[in-house]
Amino acid sequence: MASYKGLIVDVNGRSHENNLAHRTREIDRERLIVRRGQPFSITLQCSDSLPPKHHLELVLHLGKRDEVVIKVQKEHGARDKWWFNQQGAQDEILLTLHSPANAVIGHYRLAVLVMSPDGHIVERADKISFHMLFNPWCRDDMVYLPDESKLQEYVMNEDGVIYMGTWDYIRSIPWNYGQFEDYVMDICFEVLDNSPAALKNSEMDIEHRSDPVYVGRTITAMVNSNGDRGVLTGRWEEPYTDGVAPYRWTGSVPILQQWSKAGVRPVKYGQCWVFAAVACTVLRCLGIPTRPITNFASAHDVDGNLSVDFLLNERLESLDSRQRSDSSWNFHCWVESWMSREDLPEGNDGWQVLDPTPQELSDGEFCCGPCPVAAIKEGNLGVKYDAPFVFAEVNADTIYWIVQKDGQRRKITEDHASVGKNISTKSVYGNHREDVTLHYKYPEGSQKEREVYKKAGRRVTEPSNEIAEQGRLQLSIKHAQPVFGTDFDVIVEVKNEGGRDAHAQLTMLAMAVTYNSLRRGECQRKTISVTVPAHKAHKEVMRLHYDDYVRCVSEHHLIRVKALLDAPGENGPIMTVANIPLSTPELLVQVPGKAVVWEPLTAYVSFTNPLPVPLKGGVFTLEGAGLLSATQIHVNGAVAPSGKVSVKLSFSPMRTGVRKLLVDFDSDRLKDVKGVTTVVVHKKYRSLITGLHTD
């Protein structure tokens, strides 16, 4: 809203009705925010009618220094052009602007020019501005998604669930994306403005912002701070004392705010799910349908040979001292964004992998994607971007080698089906898990899978050979789902399927690791000789006590058990590996009473210490989109074993609708304890003489 002397008295951006029509009212009700490919209207208040033969012209400016100038046509022209029409000619003129579906996203400044018959500018009103976003509701937009329920989840939902753990023990954590929180949109454009391409040539960068492929790739590179002014610094092991430990974050908004307020200095620290969640926030805010993905048993194939090779000594200790070596992560998170790929052959539209975790350089930057999920499934590794790396993450072989004292290597196990399991995302229809593994690859062992492997250059093994190689001795690891703080048993079973007794040496090793396989210390080791009668099984129990693992367990509460069976006269040693996550209890979060916007409400959080030792330095962190910004409550004193701690916090909800309140608890000995509850915030009613009125 702005006032001018002369003919144009006032310009009204009609933000209330425009933002409602463009589904941007959650972002801001006062500033004008529109989506491309969809018309919007502004009103001119004039002191008089336009003089005879005078007319209006509209000019758009983009960039901090007006690097891009667009003249708006008076009548409907080409589909890729801006145009406007006007109604009324007295003291009020309604201007309706039509943007092309491939318009540049960004902050526009609009100048309204009153032109004389001879082409001179009589008056100029240029104080109105607006933001333009992608429009997944527009059929001609590259991000068009023709499913309203998916749009509500992948664009409009500010809360979500991210999956973690191991493929056979999947856990979830709540996350506050908060893409419509105050000034988050401004920070998202600030992220784009600080990319290397924008700093090098802002005009060219702005013009490319019409393309979601370009924007998605830019955001992927900018979410991590490797080599640029990116948002987050990654760190995968303690200490985190000069920043925030990755597991303590419960939402993206504090991260983005801290980055912006600190003068675009990177925030410490993130790991893969934090990188993915922040990218999801930015991309949803800009209007690109996006969802977080978790790939369990995710391969990091450094040398591109489609296999992950592990070198061990005879004590089962890793020998790979290379700075950059193959690894297998218990889980790895990235995002998928929905868009058409006009830069690629037909068949590559739809979900695209974007991975902001800094792992490998791509065109000189730490980014990955966008890579079509369809291309990964079909083994088309020549398409842009980074298809071989993504294909390996979900399809690589896993090979373990024993390096003997004389330097000779012995292959002890080769697994063609252990990577890329239970690929997961939150369902559109609730907080349960949707398995999308079959989006990435054909069923294990199918003919189609073997055809894809052959096309991608991965060695194909026929199923019959797999069975023949198993031999007469079989090795497996069994365990319950243990709770962190308790003692538990791991059972290693040796089965003898042959017709004679087997004599072997069994080595068992339990070690603490991080979720991305960094070793934190040995918990227990056991080597014994076993005799297994024909057609029988032998079970060996390794009991792990809390004192065995607490001194070295990581914040991910993960124990890796390896078992190696070496039987003279057999085909060779066999090995199996199990990753055992130690579960932690959830927080109890309650918000009693009716929630009404801008009226006080109290949240109650309680927690019982499950450990046999006191907890010191306890901190609760609460946040929720539309409810309250991230707030910490420190616990006074220690929490005794089996002791209960309770805290409460009063706040006033800021926005109506179904909201999530997220809580995290951390202490010296127990970290990453989460809780969540749903809060339905109602509109505020007040009684007037004429009846009821809704705020």
From Swiss-Prot:
InterPro entries: Ig-like_fold, Ig_E-set, Papain-like_cys_pep_sf, Transglutaminase, Transglutaminase-like, Transglutaminase-like_sf, Transglutaminase_animal, Transglutaminase_AS. One of its GO terms (molecular function) is protein-glutamine gamma-glutamyltransferase activity. Acyltransferase activity is regulated by the binding of GTP and Ca(2+): inactivated by GTP, which stabilizes its closed structure, thereby obstructing the accessibility of substrates to the active sites. In contrast, Ca(2+) acts as a cofactor by inducing conformational change to the active open form. In absence of Ca(2+), Mg(2+) may bind Ca(2+)-binding sites, promoting GTP-binding and subsequent inhibition of the acyltransferase activity. SUPFAM superfamilies: Cysteine proteinases, E set domains, Transglutaminase, two C-terminal domains. GTP binds at S476, I477, K478, H479, A480, Q481, P482, A578, N579, I580, P581. It holds the Pfam family Transglut_C. GO terms for cellular component: chromatin; cytosol; extracellular region; mitochondrion; nucleus; plasma membrane. It catalyses: L-glutaminyl-[protein] + L-lysyl-[protein] = [protein]-L-lysyl-N(6)-5-L-glutamyl-[protein] + NH4(+); L-glutaminyl-[protein] + serotonin = 5-serotonyl-L-glutamyl-[protein] + NH4(+); L-glutaminyl-[protein] + dopamine = 5-dopaminyl-L-glutamyl-[protein] + NH4(+); L-glutaminyl-[protein] + histamine = 5-histaminyl-L-glutamyl-[protein] + NH4(+). SMART domains: TGc. Keywords: Acyltransferase, Calcium, Cell membrane, Chromosome, Cytoplasm, Extracellular matrix, GTP-binding, Hydrolase, Membrane, Metal-binding, Mitochondrion, Nucleotide-binding, Nucleus, Protease, Secreted, Transferase. Its cofactor is Ca(2+). The active site is at C272, H332, D355. The record marks Y515 as: Important for catalytic activity. Its EC number is 2.3.2.13, 3.4.-.-, 3.5.1.44, 2.3.1.-. Ca(2+) binds at N395, D397, E434, E444, E449. It is found in: Cytoplasm, Cytosol; Nucleus; Chromosome; Secreted, Extracellular space, Extracellular matrix. One of its GO terms (biological process) is protein homooligomerization. Calcium-dependent acyltransferase that catalyzes the formation of covalent bonds between peptide-bound glutamine and various primary amines, such as gamma-amino group of peptide-bound lysine, or mono- and polyamines, thereby producing cross-linked or aminated proteins, respectively. Involved in many biological processes, such as bone development, angiogenesis, wound healing, cellular differentiation, chromatin modification and apoptosis. Monomer. Belongs to the transglutaminase superfamily. Transglutaminase family. This is Protein-glutamine gamma-glutamyltransferase 2. It comes from Pagrus major (Red sea bream).
